[in-house]
Amino acid sequence: MNLNHNNITFIIVTFKSENIIHDCLKTLPKDYKKIIIENSGNPKFKEDLEQKYDNLEVLLSENLGMGASNNIGIKRCNTKFAYVINPDIKFKENTLSELIKGAEQIDDFSILSPISNNSRYPNYTLSKKISVSSNILSVDCIDGYSMLINKQKFRDDIYFDENIFMYLENDDMCMKKKNEKENLYIIKNSLIDHLGGKSSDQKHKKDIELLRNWHWMWSKFYFNKKHHGIFYALFRSLKSFFSSIIKYFLYAIILNHYKKKIYKMRLLGIFNSILGKPSWYRINFKN
């Protein structure tokens, strides 16, 4: 398939990402369109970025989460392909050129991505290794921090599940496309760096960790229930549920209040998901 600057738009969801977004943007090619969805609604963030970078539009939004915010950007762009990336990734000099070369060897795809530069943390999963060529790997799932999406494969205009605030929204999308017999590929000659856990300002690290634990547990139960049914979801949650209870009381005994709060958040995430409540938990940042 033919990929170029005329048919790809980069989509980046940010939340208080001032300290990291510039490192990401500087590695992206200047002649490609970019849309940033800023979930903190910060007008100064929008003004600063749009003044500094060409071909860039910043949309201000309330804190909708990864799935809903990415959907805004994907639907906003008028190109055939939307390249969803996290603000804590960096392209190498030849990341995009090698991705394009790989795509030229493929007749058709739904989602495509470079491969993680860190082999210990692959950005894909597969049940059986299927190599289309020495450079192209057919996979079951691709991590959400780098997903080149072929919009023509989403004719219903439904991309990420907006019920999910964060975690497993990419797994949900990939499972849907695989069930539809669509193709997902990793291009092995195209490398990408992912810093991991650096997407937001680190001064909010503790609050964000609480948020992540709540939503990780909520999303796991929701995902399993959606794709495998309520009983499977309950069964898969048992170990995490009892482990969180034990650790909650353990950290209460040794007076580690922050760790205790983490496991409280995990329990609350599971409970809310079991009760069918939405992924509502947010942090009220003061600045």
Spans of features found by a protein language model:
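Acidic donor-binding segment of Leloir-type glycosyltransferases
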Residues: 25-59
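Conserved donor NDP-sugar-binding/catalytic core segment of glycosyltransferases
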Residues: 90-124
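Short, well-formed alpha-helical segments that are part of the catalytic scaffolds
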Residues: 14-30
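Glycine-rich, basic loop-to-helix element that forms the pyrophosphate-binding segment
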Residues: 60-77
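Non-catalytic, C-terminal membrane-associated alpha-helical segments of glycosyltransferases
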Residues: 211-219, 230-287
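A short, conserved alpha-helix in the catalytic core of glycosyltransferases
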Residues: 146-159, 163-191
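Short aromatic/hydrophobic "clamp" motif used to bind/position activated sugar donors
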Residues: 82
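A recurrent flexible, glycine/aromatic-enriched loop bordering the glycosyltransferase active site
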Residues: 131-152, 208
